[in-house]
A protein has these predicted regions:
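N-terminal cap/lid segment of alpha/beta-hydrolase-fold proteins
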Residues: 19-65
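Surface beta-strand/loop "capping" patches
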Residues: 294-337, 350-361, 408
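Short beta-strand element of the alpha/beta-hydrolase
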Residues: 56-59, 67-76, 96
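Primarily recognizes the serine-hydrolase "nucleophile elbow" in alpha/beta-hydrolase
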Residues: 151-212
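Cap/lid segment of the alpha/beta-hydrolase catalytic domain
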Residues: 87-90, 95-146, 196-208
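Short beta-strand/loop motif that positions the catalytic acidic residue
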Residues: 236, 242-244
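Short carbohydrate-recognition loop motifs
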Residues: 431-457
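Extracellular ligand-binding interfaces
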Residues: 450-526, 542-547, 552-553
Length: 554
């Protein structure tokens, strides 16, 4: 078939893919590390003219037990294949093959070697081919990366594994959707963050003025049709576990829901969200992964993944959110709600505990605030420690609220941790977060909040929230050592800008009442905020330990 300038589909792109060439595998080194034997391996991939792609990976097995099955792990493009995430998969008794699909990168010694004709398969040379299809979907870095994954599945099959879980992180998950769609040797699929819609990056699903990328040009249309991972969701037939954060900057939470809605009804599909997180997943996601692995490729399963559904019914000026999780034992059921914030990465998700009615049904009755649209999902913590979520739902409501509040609470410990999350940035070492929010008892037995990485609030993105030159940030703080607190406001006027103020605190065994003028916040070069309507978040950070409470704008 002549692929030049053609508009391909997933089927026409991969329908005749041939991975019958011999692997010619070699082992470069072998070492014993933390109860596992890790081998550096090379094997051959597809042919490009008279040359073959030479694939590099880490193959690891437990040194004292027979592996229950195999995991093929595809990392993110800024992640080393021997990252802590790889080691997390290794620690639960499975063989793990972590492959490099991204080719030569800065500082890399061993890496997948691509023939010169497909130089763009090296991520540093991908250029436009990572985001557009100028000629054919077959002439993109994505095609080469997926082809590497297909040969990696073959490698695991040839060394004796019948049960193979494909797991991908971020960009690696987008690669994984394409593999899972057409490689029947894959038993199940774990996708972390990546769920397609790459061409729609920064295009808000709920912004009426946003321009659809497929309206732009042929290059975008061809990309969406055959490269973007969401196009592959209807073709996946194996069980899926989808894990993501609600506030990911790069992987849109709303768009991910659209991808999951494309999965066929008969395909087991489980979801779990790390609420308020950005680059990482919560520690509880590890238990969900274990349950999924044990169920589909393990020899036995004491814990299993669970389906959770959420139904929304309007009752006058209220919405009733009803949770459905079968007859399973649950420790905690809650519904997370945000009203009025269209951009997923900027939402402050408010947690509401579900109550039980006389029929045993668990639900939340939410009072509509008339901000145009309500977003919600249900999270259930089960008795076995797993936490699974419903798909996100949204409901348009009448928009009658134009009020701007001059005084508004951001956080109070009386309302739990609502209003706060933590600064969640670099996840190149491990996808699972080791830093979160702590609730700490301060003077007079009053509880406050602290995070080693810094506290962050999206409350300022609320449509009702108003900042002016006259606004004052007020909060209580407790420290037991000298503590310079860096307070930062985040503005989005097409690019993210930061404006900060440093508040120095001395050690005192009391709650110190702090007042800071919003007009005192400055950029690195001394500029003040020009458009307060564009401020969407605030952070509090210090190298010293601090506890804060009763944060509000007056």
């Amino acid at each position: 078939m002549n692929f030049k300038n053609s508009l391909l589909t997933p089927i026409s792109l991969w329908g005749d893919f041939d991975d019958s060439l011999p692997l010619k595998s070699t082992t470069v080194s072998k070492m014993k590390v933390d109860g596992a034997i890790i081998s550096e391996v090379y094997f051959s991939g597809r042919a490009v003219g008279n040359e073959r792609v030479r694939i590099f990976g880490y193959y690891s097995v437990p040194d004292d037990i027979t592996p229950k099955g195999a995991i093929l792990y595809i990392p993110n493009d800024n992640e080393k294949i021997g990252s802590d995430t790889f080691k997390e998969f290794l620690s639960v008794g499975y063989a793990v093959l972590a492959i490099d699909v991204y080719g030569k990168r800065e500082g890399s010694v061993n890496h997948t070697e691509y023939p010169t004709a497909v130089y763009y398969a090296n991520v540093v040379n991908a250029g436009r081919r990572k985001d557009f299809v100028d000629e054919s979907a077959k002439e993109t870095c994505w095609y080469e990366w997926v082809a590497v994954g297909r040969y990696a599945v073959k490698y695991l099959k040839e060394i004796g594994f019948d049960s193979i879980c494909l797991a991908g992180n971020k960009i690696g998950a987008n690669v994984g959707w394409q593999i899972a769609a057409f490689d029947k040797r894959v038993t199940c699929f774990i996708a972390m963050f990546g769920a397609g819609w790459t061409a729609y990056k920064n295009v808000c699903k709920f912004d009426e003025n946003a321009k659809e990328p497929i309206e732009a040009d042929d290059s975008s249309r061809k990309y969406v049709a055959a490269v973007d991972a969401h196009a592959y969701a209807p073709y996946v037939r194996c069980p899926i576990l989808y894990l993501t954060s609600t506030n990911s900057t790069f992987f849109d939470f709303d768009r991910a829901g659209d991808t999951l809605s494309r999965v066929n009804d008969g395909v087991p599909c489980f979801t779990a969200y790390s609420v308020g997180y950005d680059a990482h997943l919560s520690e509880s996601a590890k238990i969900d992964v274990l349950a999924f692995l044990e169920t589909y490729i393990g020899k036995k399963s004491q814990i299993r993944p669970k389906h959770v559904d959420l139904v929304c019914k309007q009752e006058g000026d209220k919405l009733r959110f009803e949770a459905d999780y079968g007859n399973l034992k649950a420790k905690n059921i809650c519904v997370y709600v945000n009203e009025g914030v269209k951009y997923a990465s900027k939402r402050d998700w408010v947690r509401y505990e579900a109550t039980e009615d006389e029929l045993g049904k668990r639900s939340v009755l939410y009072s509509i605030e008339s901000k145009g649209i309500v977003f919600a999902f249900c999270s259930v913590e089960f008795a076995d420690g797993t936490v699974f979520c419903s798909k996100e739902i949204f409901k348009k409501v009448e928009k009658t609220s134009d009020k701007k509040l001059s005084s508004k609470l951001i956080y109070s410990s009386k309302k739990g941790l609502n209003g706060l999350t933590f600064i969640d940035e670099d996840a190149s070492i491990s996808i699972f977060a080791d830093k979160n929010i702590e609730e700490i008892i301060g003077p007079d037995g009053i509880v406050g909040a602290y995070s080693q990485s810094g506290l962050l609030s999206f409350k300022l993105c609320d449509p009702d929230f108003s900042l002016t030159d006259a606004s004052i940030l007020k909060f209580d703080a407790f420290v037991n050592e000298y503590c310079p607190l860096t307070l930062t406001l985040y503005e989005d006027d097409g690019e993210i800008k930061k404006y900060s103020f440093t508040q120095e605190l001395k050690s005192e065994n009391i709650w110190q009442n702090i007042l800071v003028k919003i007009s005192d916040f400055k950029s690195d070069v001394g500029f003040v905020i020009k458009n307060y309507d564009k401020v969407f978040a605030m952070s509090i950070k210090s190298d010293a330990k601090f506890v804060i409470n009763n944060v509000l704008i007056i």
